[in-house]
Amino acid sequence: MAVDVPTSVIVKLMFFTLAMVSFPVLTFFVSQQYTSNTLVNGGLAALAANVVLFAYVIMAFSEDVPQSDGKESKKQQ
């Protein structure tokens, strides 16, 4: 039972997966250049992960939902 998933959904998922892995790690190591406190570096990396997560949630809620024909809504009533 294969489901046709739009390519735009796959592209968004791959982008945010890559961002969720690379952005916090990059933030951690870049912030190490400015401070040697690993607690601050870890906190900034966690903040970067939350930024990516919130961006994904906002994009998911703003995504267009395909309109169905009226047949399903009549069945539910």
From Swiss-Prot:
Coiled coil: none
Gene Ontology cellular component annotations, sorted alphabetically: endoplasmic reticulum membrane; endoplasmic reticulum-Golgi intermediate compartment membrane; ER to Golgi transport vesicle membrane
Topological domain spans for side Cytoplasmic: 1-8, 63-77
Lumenal topological domain residue ranges: 30-41
Chief localization: endoplasmic reticulum
GO biological process: vacuolar proton-transporting V-type ATPase complex assembly
Compartment annotation: Endoplasmic reticulum membrane; Endoplasmic reticulum-Golgi intermediate compartment membrane; Cytoplasmic vesicle, COPII-coated vesicle membrane
Motif residue range(s): Prevents secretion from ER: 74-77
Record field: transmembrane: 9-29, 42-62
Topology within the bilayer: Multi-pass membrane protein
Domain of life: Eukaryota
Keyword terms: Cytoplasmic vesicle, Endoplasmic reticulum, Membrane, Transmembrane, Transmembrane helix
Role summary: Required for the assembly of the V0 complex of the vacuolar ATPase (V-ATPase) in the endoplasmic reticulum.
Similarity comment text for this entry: Belongs to the VMA21 family.
HAMAP family, sorted: VMA21
Protein name in the entry: Vacuolar ATPase assembly integral membrane protein VMA21
Classification of source organism: Eukaryota, Fungi, Dikarya, Ascomycota, Saccharomycotina
